[in-house]
Amino acid sequence: MITLQNLPWILLYTGFLAIFLSRLFSNGKQSRDEKANGCQPPARYPQWDPIMGLDLVYSQVSALKNNRYLEWLRDLHAKMPKTFSLNFFGQRWIYSIEPEILKAVYATNFRDFGVEPIRRHSKGSMPFADKGVNTTDGEDWEFSRLLIKPFFERNVYTDTDRIKVHADHFLSLIPADGETFDAQPLVQRWFLDLTTEFIFGESMGSLAHPERADIAWTMLDVLRGGRLRAQMHRFMWARDWTWWLKAVYKVHDYVNPYIRSTLKELAEREERIKQGLPVGPERTDLVWSMATHLRDEELLRSQLCLIIVPNNDTTSIFISNCLWHLARHPEVWKKLREEVFALGEETPLTFEILRNMKYLNGVLNETHRVIPNNVTQVRACVQDTVLPVGGGPDGKWPVQVRKGDIVSVTKTVMYRDPDYWGSDADEFRPERFDGLRGTWNFLPFGGGPRRCPAQMMSQTEAAYMLCRLARTYSRIEARDPEPYTAVMRIGPSNKTGVKIALYK
């Protein structure tokens, strides 16, 4: 008998039954399609909840909460072949560490995959942001790429003079020889000053005024909450997000005045031109460039927030991760200094010089490999397609992927796979990149049309900072005996920071 008391349970069981029958029908059709296309299914991850996959949902959220997400990913892959499928929130996910699958997702099958169903349709980023270069596909994505065109311009990413003034200030704040300090927040403030100048046309000045850096820590809360909301997906309603919403509105309060003043100045400039009156030189900062194409305040804020918040985290954490490893490998620091001093002490650190320093770039690449900012590459299948490998008992057969399936390439596991990197894959050894040609098993900034537009800028900024430190300090020491514990934001950062000491 149906009563008000048992109605919710009846609806719940009915929902599960509907999902089960739908999956049963879908699996039967997929099996027929696989045979017709010469495909075979990938190995199946064993789950005690094969219908909704709530066992993996719970374990993943728990891993994120306890700062064990990287270990969770490694454990997930440890006893499985390079490609396998599982069920997550009732959806088929294909996990892989196959370079050929990454190539298909990034390039050869690019139009068969997208990010919008995962990042935008889930509403996990709302009300922080909606449309942007990180959340859209198709024409919307192409428009967002147009808005951030300055990232691609050579005169911007090759300009090391814009880095120098902030690097000088950064170096002046490093404590005296042998004094322990946490480099991570200092690097964060340096990068905040550098990036706000590029985006807004004026630096925040957080190196001189540390209290201004509070917005950076707020941005980190936005990133942490955003990742957790994405993982919880359909169960976002089960958690109180008040703390996250406070962070979101604080970031909005920070960027809104810049947007409004820019739109006002742009309108006034256009009116003066219309009247034949003289105008000054046009601004060259990013928000000005974006505003010339997009005049809606809310839409512009969405696009801008999806640039400034993730961008503020990635490069600074990358440099911090470099320093964490260099402090534990004095022989690498010594070789880096030898390469830097071979240039001559007064040689300007230009873009061309930095990009041709083999060992320096080996250090950067090895840091990307051991602790990648982009831990996983996740794409939703937007139309039925076929992946080139991953199916069958030997993993060599093509795999049928249906619209709605999710493909996740786990870079943090791929980058440590001994099959690709040798028996010392877990070791930090920059020499491994000497003479190594680019392959699909190492793409720290992605590949294909969605390659990170800030790649050259980020690499130049990191290279410049490491060179300046190597020129100034003869020795670097680790002052934290704890192992690296990854706290997930956009990418991983060490829970206890980067406690080091430097000696001139």
From Swiss-Prot:
It is found in: Membrane. The keyword Transmembrane helix applies. The chain crosses the membrane at residues 7-26. Disulfide bonds: none annotated. It is a single-pass membrane protein. InterPro entries: Cyt_P450, Cyt_P450_CS, Cyt_P450_E_CYP52_ascomycetes, Cyt_P450_E_CYP52_fungi, Cyt_P450_sf. It holds the Pfam family p450. Keywords: Glycoprotein, Heme, Iron, Membrane, Metal-binding, Monooxygenase, Oxidoreductase, Transmembrane, Transmembrane helix. It is an enzyme of class 1 (oxidoreductase). Heme binds at residue 452. It catalyses: (3E,5S)-3-[(2E,4E,8S,10E,12Z)-1-hydroxy-4,8-dimethyltetradeca-2,4,10,12-tetraen-1-ylidene]-5-[(4-hydroxyphenyl)methyl]pyrrolidine-2,4-dione + reduced [NADPH--hemoprotein reductase] + O2 = 3-[(2E,4E,8S,10E,12Z)-4,8-dimethyltetradeca-2,4,10,12-tetraenoyl]-4-hydroxy-5-(4-hydroxyphenyl)-1,2-dihydropyridin-2-one + oxidized [NADPH--hemoprotein reductase] + 2 H2O. The keyword Lyase does not apply. GO terms for biological process: ilicicolin H biosynthetic process. Pathway: Mycotoxin biosynthesis. Its EC number is 1.-.-.-. Belongs to the cytochrome P450 family. This is Cytochrome P450 monooxygenase iccC. It comes from Talaromyces variabilis. The gene is iccC.
